[in-house]
């Protein structure tokens, strides 16, 4: 399926359950390994990425296919010193999260979502954005590097990356 059979829309409060679903999809599982239990979504360190979606500073987009099914998402949310995300850099830099359903990967959708998010962040005057990625997730790493993300540190086994928006 090509990009022209998709459209991208803003993520609203009513999308919280889909964003939770995407949070689960975003957990990187190396080839041949057991996927995480869905219970992980109830853990505070996961929940905080989408809980009460639509609060101040939240910005996100959802890709919807020709049949109206949401197939991917990209979000940013602010965290603070007392409640850090995995890709936390500072209170004034939002953290990006994105995921696509497996059948929607490798079709340019990640690039389209990223372009839309960067456009939205520029409009809001956001200057920098961070994220956390598993180093083995080479497809994601390549996409992030194309958008100017650079490694700034490690958090556990994941790489923290930072990009200039403006």
PLM region spans:
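Conserved N-terminal entry element of GNAT/NAT acetyltransferase domains
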Residues: 1-14, 166
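Conserved GNAT-fold acetyl-CoA-binding loop/helix
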Residues: 27-50
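A short helix-loop-beta-strand connector motif used in the catalytic cores of GNAT acetyltransferases and
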Residues: 47-62
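Conserved beta-strand in the GNAT
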Residues: 62, 69-78
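A short, internal acetyl-CoA/4′-phosphopantetheine-binding micro-motif in the GNAT/acyltransferase core
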Residues: 64, 95-106
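A short, polar/charged loop-to-alpha-helix boundary motif
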Residues: 80-89
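C-terminal "cap" of GNAT-fold acetyltransferases
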Residues: 90-94, 127-141, 145-166
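Conserved acetyl-CoA-binding loop-helix of GNAT-fold acetyltransferases
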Residues: 106-119, 123, 142-146
């Amino acid at each position: 399926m090509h990009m022209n059979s998709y459209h991208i829309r803003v993520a609203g409060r009513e999308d919280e359950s889909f964003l939770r679903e995407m949070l689960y999809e975003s957990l990187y599982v190396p080839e041949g390994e057991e996927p995480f239990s869905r219970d992980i979504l109830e853990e505070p360190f996961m929940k905080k990425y989408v809980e009460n979606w639509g609060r101040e500073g939240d910005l996100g987009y959802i890709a919807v296919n020709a049949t109206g099914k949401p197939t991917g998402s990209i979000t940013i949310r602010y965290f603070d010193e007392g409640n850090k995300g995995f890709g936390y850099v500072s209170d004034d830099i939002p953290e990006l999260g994105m995921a696509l359903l497996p059948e929607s990967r490798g079709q340019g959708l990640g690039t389209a979502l990223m372009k839309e998010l960067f456009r939205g962040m520029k409009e809001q005057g956001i200057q920098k954005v961070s994220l956390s990625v598993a180093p083995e997730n080479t497809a994601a790493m390549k996409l992030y590097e194309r958008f100017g993300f650079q490694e700034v540190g490690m958090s556990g086994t994941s790489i923290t990356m930072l990009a200039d928006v403006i």
